[in-house]
């Protein structure tokens, strides 16, 4: 039978079984190695409100940083595709195993 992907859509290589996790979006049971995982760091206070709060004088201490939320989201393949976290690639593009470039993230340059 033909195979669609070299790793069969999983990163289990050599393990007999892996634990299941629940999708963040739909609560479907998904093998942990197959789930699409994303780690989000978001500020609790949005940027528009930071200036207003700082102007009030409550948190105008030099170097004060507002707290941020740290959330690890795990999605099943269906929800990841539906919410555009991952995209369907053509047959030729599926063979490319390098990680796609992330927009807005600069590569570290070598120090001279």
From Swiss-Prot:
Keyword Transferase attributed: no
GO molecular function annotations of the record: mRNA binding; structural constituent of ribosome
Keywords (A to Z) from UniProt: Ribonucleoprotein, Ribosomal protein
An example Gene Ontology CC term for this record: cytosolic small ribosomal subunit
Pfam family, one: Ribosomal_S26e
Gene3D superfamilies: Ribosomal protein S26e
Residue span of region Disordered: 93-112
Biological process (GO), any one: translation
Similarity-based family: Belongs to the eukaryotic ribosomal protein eS26 family.
Name of protein: Small ribosomal subunit protein eS26
Species assigned in the record: Dictyostelium discoideum
